[in-house]
Amino acid sequence: MDFFGVLTMLGGLALFLYGMETMGKGLEKLSGGRLERILEKLTSNPIKAVLLGAGVTAIIQSSSATTVMVVGFVNSGIMKLTQAVGIIMGANIGTTVTSWLLSLTGIESGNFFVQLLKPTSFSPVLALIGVCFIMFSKKEKKKDAGTIMIGFAILMTGMETMSGAVKPLANVPEFTGILTMFSNPVLGMIAGAVLTAIIQSSSASVGILQALCATGAVNFSTALPIIMGQNIGTCVTAMLSGIGASKNAKRAALVHLYFNIIGTVIFMIVFYTINAVVHFSFLDTAANAMGIAVIHSSFNIAATIMLLPFGSGLVKLACLTIPEEKKEAPAQNQEKDAFRLLDQRFLDTP
């Protein structure tokens, strides 16, 4: 890959990230704060919490944003730590929607109606409609809808640009050598975690992995541990939002971290133990965008089903990590309670 190829790839990545950010902000504005009110009224039913977490994240296209909202609610005292567990788990499931949307780019068929399902086919139309909404509509709701459409179109343009730019890498021995190295489960997990921590979005890092699949040099043996690491790396945003927050808010961020680490470790141990006995042949085949989406979704759903019954255990583990201190004087508590409901995390979402 020459200089201009690298430039094209970075430009595609910039468009991809900007499109995702634009679409997410448009969705948040269009919701008009209703998502927060729904989360506020959440019952203690863990299954409902998971469904709500998945639904909210699917709408705003960011598990990090959902988790940060939850940390804010716990910090303000609106939500109990035990209620936050289900939403955090559901957020991991909801974030997989993005990978499914991106996987539609790989549809191969000459059928006209099937081709219409490809985002690259309908995203230009959405962009045109979005521009018309923003330029000619006087209603804020329509302007927000236009922002969402344009954000999606930019996201898909960035995805296509990245995919086209990285295709020549399939013939570069150094690139294939690096990918072979990442087929080591530990190195692959570290790579996925670091990439996601840097860009602070598991959806974006999964999208980058899906774009790399266009080279044909990425096997599932390489993709799988990277996906596992991406689930750990996405916890960085919530951990950062917990800085300066209450102990319970920090615990909520830790619940997110522990849930992803424990789920990943258990999955990796079980999967590779079985693979040592009965080799999974699909690991040797070239990965594709659809397969990445399947693995991403399957892992997060399985981890939630497995660990949801142990939600209270995750809370206890977080409480052990950040134990309670001696009770403060009543006057100090009253002063803190007076300002507890004011939380900077809510000001980003109107």
Language model segments and positions:
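Helix-loop-helix hairpins and the membrane-proximal interhelical loops
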Residues: 1-46, 145-194, 212-215
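Interfacial loop-to-helix junctions that mark the boundaries of transmembrane helices
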Residues: 1-7, 109-121, 175-181, 221, ...
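Membrane-embedded alpha-helical segments of transport systems
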Residues: 59-66, 85-101, 119-126, 155, ...
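Hydrophobic core segments of alpha-helical transmembrane domains in multi-pass membrane transport
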Residues: 9-21, 53-57, 125-137, 150-162, ...
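Membrane-interfacial helix-loop connectors
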Residues: 69-91, 99-121, 159, 196-233, ...
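Non-transmembrane accessory domains of multi-pass membrane transporters/channels
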Residues: 311-350
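Hydrophobic alpha-helical transmembrane segments of multi-pass integral membrane proteins
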Residues: 42-69, 185-208
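Structural signal for the N-terminal portions of transmembrane helices
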Residues: 116-120, 149, 249-262, 281-313, ...
